[in-house]
Curated annotation (Swiss-Prot):
PANTHER family: CYTOCHROME C-TYPE BIOGENESIS PROTEIN CCME HOMOLOG, MITOCHONDRIAL. Residues 30-181 are periplasmic. One of its GO terms (biological process) is cytochrome complex assembly. It is found in: Cell inner membrane. Keywords: Cell inner membrane, Cell membrane, Cytochrome c-type biogenesis, Heme, Iron, Membrane, Metal-binding, Signal-anchor, Transmembrane, Transmembrane helix. It is a single-pass type II membrane protein. This is Cytochrome c-type biogenesis protein CcmE. It comes from Actinobacillus pleuropneumoniae serotype 5b (strain L20). Residues 135-148, 156-166 have a biased composition (Basic and acidic residues). Belongs to the CcmE/CycJ family. NCBIfam families: PRK13165.1 (NF009638), PRK13254.1-1 (NF009727), PRK13254.1-3 (NF009729), PRK13254.1-5 (NF009731). InterPro entries: CcmE (IPR004329), CcmE-like_sf (IPR036127), NA-bd_OB-fold (IPR012340). SUPFAM superfamilies: Heme chaperone CcmE.
Length: 181
């Protein structure tokens, strides 16, 4: 090979190497900014109940669920808040330091973004509350419908208006009336 071809080959190899390094760095940077969405059940049990598809400790994720009634603990001296979030399954603990949204309440839907610091504990950097009683983030709504359907839970069950719920209310009322007499 003559010297001219060698220099051209070096330039071409250098350009290809540079493009490969740049592409690798871009993919690495993008992977650091991807926040995968999970429900609390998926964090504990894995996606589709597959333990191999659980998020890893240290991974950035987004979690959508409902704030468990009676689980909110506030630090009196700081803005630290800790609460449980669940869907229809197990709960996870969410730690957050900052001002919570005005619409944050127990029993309401939230989406928390942060880092998983233990298998069932999230250190949140952002907490979003749902906007009104009918709003639910689309990704959370889809996941909950999927899980509810698999568990045999209907929309009427969730609203407390199913035939089973009405029968349970009637039984409870009869029991209470019997105790009152």
């Amino acid at each position: 090979m003559n010297p001219r071809r060698k220099s051209r080959l070096k330039v071409v190899v250098s350009i290809i190497f540079g493009v490969a390094v740049a592409a690798g760095l871009m993919l690495y940077a993008l992977s650091q900014n991807i926040d995968l969405f999970y429900t609390p059940s998926e964090i504990v049990n894995g996606k589709n109940d597959d333990p191999d598809q659980k998020p890893e400790v240290g991974q950035r994720i987004r979690v959508g669920g409902m704030v468990v009634e009676g689980s909110v603990k506030r630090d009196d001296k700081t803005l630290k808040v800790e609460f449980e979030a669940n869907d229809i399954g197990p709960s996870i603990t969410v730690e957050y330091e900052g001002i919570l949204p005005d619409l944050f309440r127990e029993g309401q839907g939230i989406v928390a973004q942060g880092v998983l610091i233990e298998p069932t504990r999230l250190k949140a950097t952002e907490v979003l509350a749902k906007h009104d009683e009918n709003y639910m983030p689309p990704e959370l709504g889809d996941k909950l419908k999927e899980q509810h359907g698999a568990a045999g839970i209907s929309e009427a069950d969730l609203k407390g208006t199913s035939a089973r719920d009405k029968a349970e209310i009637e039984r409870t009322l009869k029991t209470l009336q019997g105790e009152a007499n």
